Regions:
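Short functional hotspots at interaction and active-site rims
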Residues: 1-175
């Protein structure tokens, strides 16, 4: 994050009053979430216990039960403990009878409702979270874009390098 903070300072000093557009590839480092991010697979089935506290959220407008759409949802209990999967899903109006907390090893690829963690992890507020990088750039008043995943040889910087490689011989004097 130090590098991007420095890049923002340099840009703002060089171009006062302008807005930068920072473009990144799909590196896992660029997608790092903050410590209080919403992560269903790190939650217990029940409230409390050894699980980290997660940030409060707003129940998405895509929530299956329209009665709860747009409502704020605290991710801690009245006593300050982290809420479990069961409580969070019940507050959203999900019927979770018969579902286990998590699949034993890995959730089946085709399944969307195999366990509580999978069900919650597919909710819009859990899926669409801003990375630390994105938040930092937006808070500074700039734009942040992520390129779609592609093969490394199709990376735009590779295209520029190839273009320069092709053009260089025609512009270099051999005398």
């Amino acid at each position: 994050m130090t590098q991007i903070k420095d890049a923002i300072k340099i840009f703002e000093a060089s171009h006062p009053g302008c807005q930068a557009v920072f473009i990144f590839d799909q590196s896992s480092a660029h997608a790092s979430l903050p410590p209080d991010a919403l992560r269903a697979f790190e939650m217990n089935k029940s409230d409390g216990g050894k699980q980290r506290k997660q940030r409060d959220t707003v129940i998405p407008m895509s929530n299956p039960d329209p009665r709860f759409r747009g409502h704020p949802q605290k991710m801690t209990t009245v006593s300050g403990e982290a809420k479990g999967l069961k409580a969070v899903l019940e507050e959203r109006g999900f019927n979770i009878k018969g579902l286990k907390a998590k699949c034993s090893l890995v959730c089946p690829f085709e399944s969307q409702k195999c366990c509580l963690a999978r069900l919650l992890s597919q909710q819009e507020d859990f899926v669409n979270q801003e990375s630390i990088l994105e938040t930092l750039i937006k808070e500074a008043g700039h734009k942040c874009l992520f390129l779609p995943k592609f093969h490394c040889e199709l990376n735009p910087i590779e295209m520029v390098s190839l273009h320069n490689y092709i053009l260089t011989p025609s512009h270099v004097s051999t005398t």
